[in-house]
A protein has these predicted regions:
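Residue-level preference for the first positions of well-ordered beta-strands
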Residues: 4, 103-105, 141
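A glycine-rich beta-strand to alpha-helix segment
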Residues: 102-121
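Charged phosphate-binding loop/patch that engages nucleotide di/tri-phosphates or the phosphate backbone
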Residues: 157-173
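Short, surface-exposed amphipathic charged segments that create phosphate/polyanion-binding patches used
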Residues: 91-97
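Alpha-helix N-cap/helix-start capping motif
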Residues: 56-60, 110-111, 138
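Glycine-rich phosphate-binding loop signature in dinucleotide/nucleotide-binding domains
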Residues: 44-46, 97-102
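Active-site-proximal alpha-helix that buttresses catalytic centers in soluble enzyme cores
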Residues: 2-81, 85, 89, 125-126, ...
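Domain-level recognition of soluble alpha/beta enzyme cores
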Residues: 121-162
Length: 173
């Protein structure tokens, strides 16, 4: 069993219209939401074995505010392939993870994260897949338990969404 944490970056700022998409920072609301998610991770003792993060400014800032929750010892890799990647690209990257890792967190962007979550998750009765399909807002975390022993075996329908937490669920939006 492998556990995958898919975290969409928190709300970004559109104040400076001259910035490239890659360079947009978090908004005030986004900073608060990312901090609240870090506290949620700490409360629930969610500590991934590895973090793969888009190098975009808003994803890096989101991760910085989570680090109190997951701790500084978690290895983090900033990978350009995660920036604005589609689901097949993200899946290919995850399949290359070291099998000694029981869990991994992907901090990235939509629509790729949402598409990946929906592809990996089989239909389920708990309603979380339907909730996520309706909207995977900024600052949200989807937890997927994949019924595989090796990351290379990740494929559509191999997992189930065991938790879906939005910033608004934490009182941060």
């Amino acid at each position: 069993m492998k556990t995958l944490y898919l975290l969409r970056h928190a709300k970004s700022s559109w104040k400076d219209s001259g910035l490239e998409d890659f360079d947009r920072p978090l908004s005030k609301r986004g900073r608060a939401a990312a901090k609240a998610m870090g506290e949620y991770l700490a409360r629930h003792r969610i500590v991934p074995a590895q973090v793969l993060c888009s190098p975009a400014k808003r994803t890096r800032e989101t991760l910085e505010r989570l680090q109190d929750g997951i701790g500084p010892a978690v290895p983090v890799r900033f990978e350009k392939v995660v920036y604005m990647a589609d689901a097949p690209t993200l899946l290919r990257r995850l399949r290359r993870l070291n099998d000694t890792l029981a869990s991994a967190m992907l901090v990235g962007h939509n629509p790729g994260l949402e598409q990946l979550a929906l592809a990996l998750a089989a239909e389920e009765e708990n309603g979380l897949r339907r909730e996520l399909a309706a909207k995977f807002p900024t600052g949200s975390l989807a937890v997927i338990e994949a019924d595989v022993e090796r990351w290379a075996d990740l494929k559509p329908g191999c997992g189930r969404i065991t938790a879906f937490t939005r910033a608004k669920d934490l009182g941060a939006e």
